[in-house]
């Protein structure tokens, strides 16, 4: 007897289910798409325990005739294609004939359906086996219930995520379908609680508002273009409204939501330099084309497609977005808080002074952490870094760059600068001895550094350049310090300590701050409320998918409390599962950057001295939290070589 045998239908369906039915969201997607293909204008989705216990889809579509009910649950049985030519002209969302038998093979399924012309059909299937079939009274449409998903495949059930995660996956796919078909009214319920309701009036902007909030919808730019092969319609947000991941961009091809990286990349390219690095827009793009130009038969899940004229399509998307942005005013409203990536902000600050015209410098506005004494004039070297930056009351005078004060450092008597330069040098006749001596000095310096650990030697300020770089000296030579990076390191260590203990120091807000989220974001955050308290986010549920913040830690940078809260919330949504250690680190880095002095801000000599002294107290005074250098050293010997005082 041969070793190769044909698998029975039930086992084949179980294998197919592994590709088609990965989780409850897959079931919802397939069943809702079937309802849309059946010309439904209203679809209700009822879930229990994120679909693991029960999924029920009710539509008002065409229904299924009695004679087709059994055939519909056979593999590769479909009403949507007849021959191979139809495979290249697919207009429907489904066509493979795999979804229903795959779902029925791993669940307990009940179907009630009617075409409206005859009595309805009641069908019960368990694990792929038909248990009951009978006629029943039913309105036109289909009512299908899937219970105990994966009851006969415990290995698959074992890999399911938490209720919140699985529900988030379902809401995400329902959102995409709602955007793809705004002409269909969708209602989503979980444990009898309504989560989403779209009107079905065909206005995709209303759908976007119900998903991402009205505030985001107000910042949408309409996109529309047409070529010989493609028609593009959609909305994208103004550059001031961005997110930290591409997940907020949705691409629709002939009414089908698809995941296509090159399309998302084309949307980004359409913004060109309008977006900060690492930031992404919220966007919805619907593309209509001849079905011959797109292959949807790539994967059973039908989320991947291939285009035959991909480059032409990408070029059209890029040019359409660029043209749209040229027609509108892109200056953000004063009332809108524009979020910026802290690392991008600091990189931009480094170049602000390069092309600036000379101007009369003014004292910087320094942000103090809440709780600091704002009347204090003298800097203090200590534990609360921002005290250093309170401007003195007297009128400020521009710093005299590179002019030493009386108490400043005096050159070492060993310096060769004090001696006249001679054309002939005694060591020139013995270069080898000099190189050995120089090497010994370098080894000695390394040993001294190893003994001192991270201790930064005392630095004596001598001036400031462009309100950005501090010049200081000691007997080792000249130091150039990036003042923003220096205070960023100081603030980082201060906030890193504070973020670890938040319960004792809390400031009440006069007006609670409201945070509106999409349903997917809301569910993700709701799951982490207790963990978020550990990093200073005290959230209370407010309404359907909103939170309010009534208080915050006193050490939040003054005047930037709401921006800090928004940034931290975005980190939580991006991380999906909160890692407290990582979130504390990100929060400390973010706040240290926002609370630090910027480029083109002039400081008094006392302020500079206090900054350098406190930098010495940090555990790592050499790099900022982003890894950029804080100071650069030029030895006296290197300077003398530059000026040809030694050869």
Curated annotation (Swiss-Prot):
One of its GO terms (biological process) is mismatch repair. GO terms for molecular function: ATP binding; ATP hydrolysis activity; ATP-dependent DNA damage sensor activity; mismatched DNA binding. The keyword DNA damage applies. SMART domains: DNA_mis_repair, MutL_C. The keyword Electron transport does not apply. InterPro entries: DNA_mismatch_repair_CS (IPR014762), DNA_mismatch_repair_MutL (IPR020667), DNA_mismatch_S5_2-like (IPR013507), HATPase_C_sf (IPR036890), MutL/Mlh/PMS (IPR002099), MutL/Mlh/Pms-like (IPR038973), MutL_C (IPR014790), MutL_C_dimsub (IPR042120). It comes from the Bacteria. This protein is involved in the repair of mismatches in DNA. It is required for dam-dependent methyl-directed DNA mismatch repair. May act as a 'molecular matchmaker', a protein that promotes the formation of a stable complex between two or more DNA-binding proteins in an ATP-dependent manner without itself being part of a final effector complex. Belongs to the DNA mismatch repair MutL/HexB family. This is DNA mismatch repair protein MutL.
């Amino acid at each position: 007897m041969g070793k190769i045998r044909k698998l029975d239908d039930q086992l084949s369906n179980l294998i197919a289910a592994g590709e088609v039915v990965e989780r409850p969201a897959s079931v919802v997607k397939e069943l809702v798409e079937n309802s849309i293909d059946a010309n439904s204008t209203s679809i209700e989705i009822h879930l229990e325990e994120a679909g693991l216990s029960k999924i029920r889809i009710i539509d008002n579509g065409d229904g299924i005739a009695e004679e087709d009910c059994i055939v519909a649950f056979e593999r590769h049985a479909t009403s949507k294609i007849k021959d191979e030519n139809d495979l290249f002209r697919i207009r429907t969302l489904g066509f493979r004939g795999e979804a229903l038998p795959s779902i029925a093979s791993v669940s307990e399924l009940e179907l009630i359906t009617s075409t409206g012309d005859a009595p309805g059909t009641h069908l019960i299937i368990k694990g792929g086996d038909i248990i009951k079939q009978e006629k029943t009274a039913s309105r036109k449409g289909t009512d299908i219930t899937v219970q105990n998903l994966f009851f006969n495949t415990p290995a698959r059930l074992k890999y399911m995520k938490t209720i919140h995660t699985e529900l988030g996956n379902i809401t995400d796919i329902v959102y995409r379908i709602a955007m793809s078909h705004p002409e269909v009214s969708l209602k989503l319920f979980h444990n009898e609680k309504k989560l989403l309701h779209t009107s079905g009036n065909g206005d995709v902007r209303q759908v976007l508002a119900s998903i991402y909030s009205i505030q985001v919808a107000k910042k949408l730019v309409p996109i529309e273009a047409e070529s010989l092969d493609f028609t593009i319609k959609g909305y994208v947000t103004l550059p001031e409204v961005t997110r930290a991941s591409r997940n907020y961009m949705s691409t629709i091809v002939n009414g089908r939501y698809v995941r296509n990286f090159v399309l998302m990349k084309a949307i980004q390219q359409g913004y060109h330099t309008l977006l900060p690095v690492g930031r992404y827009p919220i966007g919805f793009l619907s593309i209509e084309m001849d079905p011959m130009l797109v292959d949807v038969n790539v994967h059973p899940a039908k989320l991947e497609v291939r285009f035959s004229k991909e480059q032409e399509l990408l070029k059209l998307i890029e040019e359409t977005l660029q043209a749209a942005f040229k027609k509108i005013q892109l200056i953000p409203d004063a009332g809108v808080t524009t979020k910026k990536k802290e690392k991008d902000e600091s990189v931009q600050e480094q170049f602000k002074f390069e092309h600036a015209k000379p101007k009369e410098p003014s004292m910087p506005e320094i942000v103090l952490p809440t709780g600091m004494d704002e009347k204090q004039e003298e800097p203090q070297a200590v534990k609360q870094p921002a005290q250093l930056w309170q401007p003195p009351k007297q009128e400020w005078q521009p710093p005299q760059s590179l002019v030493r004060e009386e108490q400043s450092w005096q050159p070492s008597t060993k310096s060769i600068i004090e001696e006249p330069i001679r054309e002939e040098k005694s060591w020139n006749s013995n270069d080898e001895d000099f190189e050995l001596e120089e090497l010994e000095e370098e080894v000695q310096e390394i040993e001294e550094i190893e003994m001192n650990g991270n201790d930064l030697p005392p630095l004596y300020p001598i001036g400031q350049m462009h309100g950005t770089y501090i010049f200081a000296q000691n007997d080792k030579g000249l130091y150039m310090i990036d003042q923003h990076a220096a205070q960023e390191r100081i603030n980082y260590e201060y906030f890193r300590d504070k973020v670890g203990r938040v319960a004792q120091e809390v400031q009440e807000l006069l007006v609670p701050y409201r945070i509106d989220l999409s349903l997917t974001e809301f569910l993700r955050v709701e799951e982490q409320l207790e963990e978020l308290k550990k990093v200073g986010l005290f959230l209370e549920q407010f309404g359907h998918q909103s939170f309010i913040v009534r208080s915050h830690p006193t050490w939040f940078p003054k005047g930037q409390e709401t921006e800090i809260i928004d940034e931290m919330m975005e980190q939580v949504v991006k991380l999906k599962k909160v890692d407290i250690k990582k979130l504390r680190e990100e929060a400390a880095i973010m706040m240290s950057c926002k609370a630090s002095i910027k480029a083109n801000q002039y400081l008094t000599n006392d302020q500079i001295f206090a900054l350098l002294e406190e930098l010495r107290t940090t555990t790592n005074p050499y790099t900022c939290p982003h890894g950029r250098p804080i100071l650069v050293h030029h030895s006296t010997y290197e300077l003398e070589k530059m000026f040809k005082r030694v050869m």
